Regions:
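Extracellular beta-strand elements of beta-rich domains used
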Residues: 14, 209-214
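Extracellular glycan-recognition surfaces and repeat-rich motifs
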Residues: 18-57
Length: 221
């Protein structure tokens, strides 16, 4: 079912009692069996990881336990421009992110939603990376597609912005954070995709999530 809208705005705070889980779908990472969850704090959400886990462990041997992802439950069909933003922070070095996924697969073992091809816009202490994750012969693969070198501090709130624009050459991504911007094309993205957030490689805190779509864009059920 396609619901065409004149314009679309979605905005939620992740403060306690201010958001609905029904607006989102939890998504499993394709590299691990772990299917994570969020821990609700007063003004944000953070991955639900073992309380005694060190930050270094969450970045290395406990990487899978730190991975928690969810997407806005409705798929965007873009006409011109879509803007997605989230206010986030990290406790140690990395790596809260915005995710763009053309489609969602299903885990063969459990049937829960699982990422296939997707793009990650990742904030960390040395800058921002854009990673392109693919699904080849039933296995995940990934490559760094673009990046910005910049210093970002732990325990500091940043608003990460992703602007996706439809152009004659395909979908163009412009990333902005704390006054810095960079951009790249996303070949093969297409005009339909899910938008969401992922916490990984350390404790990541998310304070809000917003999507704004231009006139003529649509939502798919």
């Amino acid at each position: 079912m396609i619901s065409v809208v004149e314009a679309f705005e979605f905005s939620t705070s992740f403060a306690r009692g201010k958001w609905s889980e029904n607006d989102f779908v939890m998504v499993k990472g394709p590299r691990w069996d772990n299917f994570g969850s969020w821990l609700q704090m007063d003004d944000h959400i953070v991955q639900n990881v073992p309380a005694n886990a060190s930050e270094k462990d969450l970045q290395t041997r406990m990487h899978s336990e730190a991975y928690v992802a969810m997407c806005f439950a409705k798929k965007i069909r873009m006409a011109k421009k879509v803007i997605c933003s989230s206010t986030m922070s990290f406790d140690y070095r990395m790596a809260p992110l915005i995710v763009i996924a053309p489609t969602l697969g299903k885990c063969e073992k459990t049937g829960v939603p699982e990422f296939r091809e997707h793009w990650e816009i990742v904030l960390y202490d040395k800058g921002i990376n854009v990673w392109h994750h693919t699904w080849e012969n039933g296995k995940p693969a990934w490559v760094k597609f673009s990046y910005l070198l910049e210093e970002y501090l732990p325990n500091t709130k940043y608003q990460l912005n992703a602007v996706i624009t439809d152009t004659p050459k395909g979908q163009m991504l412009e990333v902005g954070c704390n006054g810095k911007k960079f951009g790249c094309f996303l070949p093969g993205l297409g005009k339909e995709f899910y938008l969401g957030i992922i916490g990984c490689e350390g404790r990541n805190r998310f304070y809000d999530f917003k999507i704004s779509a231009d006139k003529g864009d649509a939502l798919t059920e």
